[in-house]
């Protein structure tokens, strides 16, 4: 149970003085652990900002070394009220959020595994009028090790059963994105460089307190580290990206074969 102190007081305020979450853990003789995490209902209001959360129940399992981890659980609902940069009141709500996933730590220091996230409904409203309604959203991701555990093949599946914008039914969509032949060591180097650069940005108040400048610098950090990912000549495949509505259905299939600039002998175009 979380202790109420100066650091955690804002969380207790949101939970009306109650502990915002409780964790009950069990550790076996092998050192493996299982934890039941109970997130308590939250209600927070300050001026034009409001946050309401139904609470949720999650279970976290880990082996003794923390190399194998799984997390599953669900939250019934949540709502956020805020004011955007145009001084408009914006409200976001969600219903029935569920997650289920597991991962293991690979030899090169990055995690691989499976993750699934689903959301029954999400609404976005501006000035009391519904702008968008998304129903039946599901994201599934997986990554597998090949070539003696040195290479990653990954896949992301996204589906949306219904999208309505200003009460107009725009249809449903699906996306399957595959990225193969990712060099594990290169991915680790990319991750370390990118994370180090973004953490350095947060230590600079003139950047961290300017959202537009911060996003610009984060993008620069991403693209400066991106060439590291080209080791192994990864392949990106989109098959399909499809959208279906009352007018019909359209689909796109695309494959990109990337080359490591350090190994290519062709002159840049």
Go through the PLM ranges and name each one.
Residues 1-269:
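Glycine-rich, small/hydroxylated-residue low-complexity segments
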């Amino acid at each position: 149970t979380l202790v109420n102190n100066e650091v955690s007081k804002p969380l207790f305020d949101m939970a009306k003085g109650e502990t915002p979450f409780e964790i009950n853990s069990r550790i076996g003789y092998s050192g493996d652990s299982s934890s039941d995490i109970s997130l308590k209902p939250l209600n927070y209001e300050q001026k034009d900002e409001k946050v309401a959360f139904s609470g949720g129940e999650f279970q976290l399992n880990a082996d003794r070394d923390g190399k194998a981890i799984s997390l599953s659980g669900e939250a019934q609902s949540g709502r956020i009220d805020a004011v955007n940069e145009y001084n408009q009141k914006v409200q976001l709500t969600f219903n029935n959020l569920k997650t289920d996933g597991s991962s293991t730590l690979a030899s090169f220091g990055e995690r691989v595994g499976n993750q699934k996230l689903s959301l029954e409904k999400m609404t976005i409203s501006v000035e009391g009028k519904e702008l968008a309604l998304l129903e039946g959203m599901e994201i599934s991701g997986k990554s597998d090790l090949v070539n003696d555990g040195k290479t990653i093949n990954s896949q992301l599946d996204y589906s949306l059963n219904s999208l309505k914008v200003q009460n107009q039914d725009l249809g449903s969509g699906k996306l399957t994105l595959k990225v193969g032949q990712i060099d594990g060591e290169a991915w680790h180097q990319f991750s370390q460089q990118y994370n180090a650069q973004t953490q350095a940005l947060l230590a600079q108040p003139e950047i961290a307190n300017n959202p537009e400048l911060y996003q610009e610098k984060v993008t620069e950090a991403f693209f400066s580290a991106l060439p590291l990912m080209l080791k192994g000549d990864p392949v990106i495949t989109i098959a399909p990206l499809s959208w279906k509505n009352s007018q019909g259905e359209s689909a796109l299939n695309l494959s990109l074969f990337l080359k490591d600039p350090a190994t290519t002998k062709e002159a840049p175009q």
